Amino acid sequence: MAVLSKLALAASFALCGVSAAGIQQQPLTAPSSLSSSHETAVDYSSKPLIDSEALQNAISIDALVKRAEKFYKFAQTSEEEYGHPTRVIGSSGHEETLNYIANTLLDLGDYYNVSVQEFPVTLSNVFQFRLVLADEVSKSAIPMGLTPPTKDKEPVHGDLVLVKNSGCNASDYPKNVKGNIAFIRRGECAFGDKSIGAGKAGAKAAVIFNTDPEELHGTLGLPVEDHIATFGIDGVEGKKIADKLADGESLDAIAYIDAEVKQIQTVNVLAQTEQGDPDNCVMLGGHSDGVAEGPGINDDGSGSMSVLEVAVQLTKFKVNNCVRFAWWAAEEEGLLGSDFYAENLSEEENQKIRLFMDYDMMASPNFAYQIYNATNAESPAGSEELRNLYVDWYKSQGLNYTFIPFDGRSDYDGFIRAGIPAGGIATGAEAVKTKEEEEMFGGHAGQWLDPCYHQLCDDLGNLNHTAWEVNTKLIAHSVATFALSFEGFPKREVESETISAYGQTMKHHGPKLIL
């Protein structure tokens, strides 16, 4: 592996690009080790063996808040380009975040082997868009992630043509789709497949309408030649239009998307203890990037900062098992960093990871203490034991908790698909707090758990300090437990049937729908 000095780190993270409305991974580049220009040797003999209570006691909200203030300043460096603070992939705010994480780890001496894993990504930015359906501007229209622009980045006009079934087969597209705008129902196949089908049939653009009332935030996936400009609209507007078309009414449409698709480089940052059994590693991570719409201080500044603070405090101890920390890039664009890492592990390296713990959004203002409801029947063996560790800790603190399902929206996904036990905790995103949850956790029923999820207001005021400190202590407990021993934890096994069943149930891959 190439060794880079700390002084060369900025050059290593010189990432060029623009706001990513969509992004997709490309082939592997191996991790490269980094070394500090003033590396300090660590005397392990003087350190006590890892102890959960001691590591938890080292966590303070004051230290976390200081890191949050730095993250917000990083986001502010993007204001000139984006018009507001952001740490989105490709921005100076994200570049500064990566440098800060890596430099903080390098300053800890040789306790960790710090490395970066570089990979190219295709990202797209939508600058302007407009969709007119039957002489009315669509209020729910959202361009699909990684959509190409309309021809010549100009408006295109045509009749709306209702596609048969769900537009998953070539036979679903009537001949009169050619030169017009395809109107396609969501379901049965991926959005990208629908766009390809419409493109091959000669449509100028495609509109996919939801079967649910909600807006349709989706992605086409890796760009291919036959993709055409594609929108998603909500089910209320979609049903109204579809019913009229089904009744034989003629409706026209105007579609316009000005978008750019380009490729940049980004990195995952990794740190593994030099000490501890390298064949039995506990791994944990959060994502380093945010969305273009805001600074991303809770999502996932909170999780990535919690993981970093635990990494810093862990250096006070010696460990029996290796601990591997990760800060994933491009999570908001489809879990690309964690997918990239997990999919390219050799079989030998895969088996060394005993479990992966995902920490995404630790400080939602209207929080609930959430645990992924992993079971060994539906996830790799060990996932249930990890779930129970979180349950036992919350109970020991006299705290309530609630279970949430795996839904494919965070970085545990790639590990489960790779057969690695996984789980995690969270405090909630756009889910509405129930009355029962209000009684369990306080806050306000009827409001989002994070009212600023994926918005400009996800700033320093969008952090619940109580939840953040509590959950960071739980992260410390999870690390300390497995850094000490895997006694009673299932050994790794290959579980292809479980992995296959998991993959077939996911409609999300990251924050956006894929089908």
Task: Specify the residue positions occupied by each region the protein language model found.
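N-terminal hydrophobic or amphipathic helices/low-complexity stretches enriched
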Residues: A21-L98, N103, L108, Q272-Q275, ...
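Catalytic-core environment of secreted peptidases
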Residues: D62-E81, I89, T104, L108-G109, ...
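Noncatalytic luminal/extracellular "stalk/propeptide" segments of secretory-pathway proteins
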Residues: K66-E69, K73-G179
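Short helix-loop-beta-strand segments that form the rim/entrance of peptidase-like active sites
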Residues: H84, P223-D226, V312-L336, Y359, ...
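Extracellular/luminal Protease-associated
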Residues: I89, S138-G235, Y401
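Soluble metallo-hydrolase cores and metallopeptidase-like ectodomains found primarily
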Residues: P148-G167, L222-I297, E309-V312, N320
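Metal-dependent peptidase/peptidase-like ectodomains
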Residues: A292, K318-V319, W328-K435, G443
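His/Asp/Glu-rich mid-to-C-terminal helical/loop segments that flank catalytic regions of hydrolases
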Residues: V432-K507, I514-L515
